[in-house]
């Protein structure tokens, strides 16, 4: 009886050992894959494809791996001809998030001729639409080149007012640069003047790093001079990311915390191949770069 008991115990122990070994093997196979980096796309990058096949284009953007999108198709309370909630659903159903959109209404020329009743009604509609779409940011993509310092100051005052309205709705107002902002008006650099004369609590700057370089300036110098003002960065190159050698992406990313950057948005305006090839190549460039962190949210 004792022998049978010992034999049974031995069999049970061996079985337990084998079962445990199998479980350990399974656990090794179930180690989660490396977390995906947070990389967003400005949908202007696929502007013609969106016109031809909106749903198919969004699906391809998601398949590449992008975390979310910034819209470039706002008009009269709609995004790409859809109600804000429908636009949001189309992006979220694809597994991405809606971060922001480019929109804006310029002042009259001269600014004193602006119809303020119509202007504020336009902004009320735009702000509500961005809020309903679940966006965090509303970004002004462009202004006419100011002819005088008074024109430039009028835009700074205007953006402070719009930014206050955005804050009240739970949004943040941003301004996206090109290269003309790095010219002077009456002895003042346009970009610097805007940074100095807008309220950081009401207006952030979506720095387009490529256009800064084309304007003869270094993005990191601005991060040092205006820390915390650049909450969203437009990551762009002359063609696909990393091809021109003109943009020091590693230095930009290494100083992202100084900039105050929380989100990085890829924009590809010109391509060597198709737009889809271009946005995939640009995504892969960042996703494979050791200097790019998984997330820049604090």
Predicted regions and their residues:
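Bacterial N-terminal signal peptides that target proteins for export
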Residues: 1-8
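C-terminal motif of bacterial Sec signal peptides marking the signal peptidase cleavage site
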Residues: 18-21
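Acidic/histidine-rich catalytic cores of soluble enzymes
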Residues: 68-69, 167-253
């Amino acid at each position: 009886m004792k022998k049978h008991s010992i034999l049974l115990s031995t069999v049970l122990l061996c079985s337990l050992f084998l079962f445990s070994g199998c479980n350990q093997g399974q656990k090794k196979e179930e180690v989660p894959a490396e977390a995906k980096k947070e990389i967003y796309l400005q949908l202007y990058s696929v502007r013609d494809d969106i016109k031809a096949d909106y749903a198919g284009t969004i699906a391809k953007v998601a398949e590449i791996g992008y975390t979310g999108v910034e819209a470039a198709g706002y008009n009269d309370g709609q995004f790409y001809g859809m109600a804000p909630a429908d636009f949001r659903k189309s992006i979220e159903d694809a597994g991405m998030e809606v971060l922001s959109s480019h929109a804006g209404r310029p002042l009259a020329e001269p600014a004193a001729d602006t119809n303020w009743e119509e202007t504020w009604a336009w902004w009320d509609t735009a702000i509500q639409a961005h809020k309903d779409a679940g966006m965090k940011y509303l970004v002004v993509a462009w202004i006419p080149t100011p002819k005088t310092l008074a024109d430039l100051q009028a835009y700074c005052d205007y953006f402070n007012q719009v930014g206050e309205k955005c804050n009240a709705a739970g949004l943040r107002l941003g301004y996206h640069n090109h290269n003309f902002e790095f010219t002077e008006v009456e002895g003042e650099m346009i970009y610097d003047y805007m940074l100095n004369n807008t309220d950081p609590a009401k207006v952030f700057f979506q720095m387009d790093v490529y256009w800064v370089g084309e304007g003869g300036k270094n993005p990191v110098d601005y991060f040092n001079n205006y820390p915390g003002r650049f909450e969203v960065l437009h990551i762009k190159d002359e063609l696909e990311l990393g091809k021109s050698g003109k943009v020091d992406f590693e230095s930009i990313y290494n100083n992202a915390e100084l900039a105050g950057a929380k989100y990085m948005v890829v924009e590809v305006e010109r391509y060597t191949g198709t737009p889809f090839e271009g946005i995939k190549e640009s995504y892969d460039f960042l996703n494979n770069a050791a200097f790019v962190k998984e997330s820049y949210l604090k």
